[in-house]
């Protein structure tokens, strides 16, 4: 049943509450909703956002097809439309008529489709959501949202080193593409460096969904904290053997799932003790939580 408050927010939240929509997919729908509102009410436009959200919308459509349509459908790579500078005359009346015909046909197909038990549908929805491929842009979008929810300022497109964002007193920043002297991975750029004020407290490495995340911790996750540049030494709050950052994280943006143990969740390693092992977290540490751990 539709919620009493029949807004987009309420509908999305109802689907999550009833187990028909994962948190990640809900985050994407909320992102689409917000950027749409921004475009309509603030005249906002961004080619980068448009391309990223178009890819995510395509991924949502594939999930919908595999959940409510053809369960045998297999993923097909999205092809970005070429830029078209031609002005095309559109017959609006014909377009609306065609849309109405397609909607009617879809309703008839739905009415004649085999009935699927609710629990079976939920199982399929979650299975498809957890197995679907994610683009790097989607992974970054999800991580940004997750970090913001626990109190970090995160925005991969705007809060990044190349846009002159630097550690600042009074701010809790997740600065994207932060340079180090490392020679491994992304040319020495950490996906995010976490700063509480002017204190460098963590490094985050974001990876593709098929990667084994604990191995990322042992590779880039350890190398970046070793290779902090001389000009960034002023942000270092201590040294633990060869490490100049206390905490390191790796993730692919996927929520922790026991059946995909090493390929899901947020993996964390406290570098302050050499015998510590990587462990899976169910959510990001907040700045306050990190400060409490540092003080322990």
Regions found by a protein language model. Give the residues of each.
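Charge-enriched, short contiguous segments at helix-coil
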Residues: 23-76
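ATP-dependent helicase/translocase motor core
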Residues: 69-296
């Amino acid at each position: 049943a539709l919620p009493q408050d029949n807004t987009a927010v309420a509908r999305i939240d109802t689907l999550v509450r009833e187990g028909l929509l994962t948190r990640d997919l809900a985050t994407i729908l909320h992102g689409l909703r917000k950027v749409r509102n921004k475009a309509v009410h603030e005249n906002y436009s961004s080619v980068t956002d448009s391309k990223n959200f178009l890819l995510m919308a395509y991924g949502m459509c594939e999930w919908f097809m595999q959940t409510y349509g053809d369960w045998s459908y297999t993923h097909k790579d999205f092809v970005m439309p070429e830029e078209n500078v031609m002005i095309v005359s559109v017959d609006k009346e014909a377009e609306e008529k065609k849309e109405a015909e397609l909607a009617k046909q879809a309703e008839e197909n739905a009415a004649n489709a085999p009935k699927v038990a609710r629990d079976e549908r939920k199982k399929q929805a979650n299975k498809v959501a957890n197995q679907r491929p994610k683009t790097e842009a989607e992974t970054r979008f999800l991580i940004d949202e997750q970090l913001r929810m626990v109190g970090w300022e995160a925005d991969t497109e705007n809060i990044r080193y190349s846009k002159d964002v630097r550690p600042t007193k009074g701010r809790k920043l997740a600065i994207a593409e932060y340079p180090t002297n490392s020679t491994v991975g992304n040319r020495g750029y950490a996906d995010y460096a976490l700063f509480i004020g002017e204190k460098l407290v963590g490094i985050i490495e974001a990876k593709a969904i098929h990667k084994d995340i604990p191995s990322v911790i042992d590779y880039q996750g350890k190398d970046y904290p070793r290779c902090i540049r001389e000009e960034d030494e002023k942000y270092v709050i201590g040294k633990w053997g060869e490490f100049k950052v206390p905490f390191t994280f790796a993730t692919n943006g996927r929520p922790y799932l026991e059946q995909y143990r090493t390929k899901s969740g947020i993996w964390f390693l406290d570098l302050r003790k050499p015998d510590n092992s990587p462990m899976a977290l169910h959510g990001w540490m907040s700045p306050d939580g990190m400060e409490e751990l540092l003080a322990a």
